[in-house]
Amino acid sequence: YKDLASDNLIVGKDAYLLYAKATQIFKELNQDPLEEGISELAEISSSAKISSSATISSFCKISDNADIGQEVQIGSGVVIGESTIIGDKTVIHSNVSIYHSVSIGQECIIHAGSVVGSDGLGFVREGQDWEKIEHLGKVIIGNNVEIGSNCSIDRGSVGNTCLDDQVKLDNNVHLAHNVQLGRSSVIAANTAIAGSTTIGKN
C-alpha cells in the first residue's frame, strides 16, 4: 500500500472498524472537555454521594441519595433524581432529566434533552374519568449504552424497563414501560417501542 499514498497509512483487515477507532483518537485530541470539578452553581443534596473525580456543571440538580461514580461528566442543566445511580465514566449531556431510582451503568453516554424514568401511559376508565396507574418499577441501563438526544425511556409499571450492555439508541427514540432490549441492540431514529416489548440481542 505504500505506493498508493505519500503520507501515513492505517492498514488492517477491517477498514471501517479502524476508521471508528481513529475517530475516537481525533475526538480526544480536538474536543473541549467540561470544566473539571463541581460548579458552585450546581444544587447538590447533602445526602448525595459524589466521587471526587466527577464533573458536575452549572445549574445541575443532584437529589437525595443519588450516587455519582468516578470520572462521571454531567453537563449543565441536568437533573438527577432521588436514589439514582450513575456508573463510572458515564457522560450525561446538557438538559437531561433522570428520574428517581434509575440505575445507569459504566461508560454510558446520554445526549442532550433525553428523559429517563418518566411514567408510561397507564390509565383505567372509571365512568367518564381516567384513574392513573402509578408506575412503581425502575429503569435499569447496563454498561456502554449510548442514548441519543431527545429520547424518552419510561420506567416499568411494576417490573423494570431494562437496556442491556452495549445497547445504542438513535435520536428521538421512545421506549414504553417494561421494554426489554437485549445486549447490543441498535434502534434507529424516530422509533417508538410499545410497552412490554422484548427485543433480543444483536
Regions found by a protein language model. Give the residues of each.
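Structural signal for interior beta-strand "rungs" in well-ordered beta-sheet cores
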Residues: 37-202
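Short, basic phosphate-binding NTP loop
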Residues: 1-46
